[in-house]
A protein has these predicted regions:
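Conserved NTP phosphate-binding and transfer environment spanning the P-loop NTPase/kinase superfamily
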Residues: 1-122
Length: 122
């Protein structure tokens, strides 16, 4: 039903990280996403600035990630860029994707478009 309304009203939907960045919780470089950056992302989404940005597709989660956003350093738009160790990030992303995939199996009879839009843990 939500998807139908989003499509019907040609609505853009944005997912904004307001949680942990730079690593898993408890890791040395792990930190909460900075509130001014979160606010800047929400503002850019609401005023239409984010629609003008160039996006790249996240290879694991399939999300369109902006390459730029007014008021936000580019590295804060990429979770991978915030981790010191690329391999550790990739392992954590794959593990999280596998958790999403496992949890989603309880939802049967979903359209292929929905199933195929989910994370890829290959």
């Amino acid at each position: 039903m939500l998807g139908k309304k989003i499509e019907e009203h040609e609505t853009n939907v944005y997912l904004v990280n307001t949680g942990w960045a730079g690593g898993r919780y408890g890791m040395e470089r792990c930190f909460r996403m900075k509130l001014p950056y979160t606010r800047a992302m929400v503002t850019a989404a609401l005023n239409g600035e984010l629609e003008k940005a160039e996006f790249e597709k996240d290879p694991v989660f399939g999300l369109a990630v902006p390459k730029s956003c007014p008021g936000v350093p580019a590295e804060f738009l990429s979770q991978k860029a915030l981790w010191q160790d690329d391999k550790a990030y990739e392992a954590a992303a794959k593990e999280l994707a596998q958790s999403f995939i496992k949890n989603f199996k309880k939802y049967t009879n979903m359209p292929d478009a929905i199933v195929n839009a989910g994370p890829k843990a290959e």
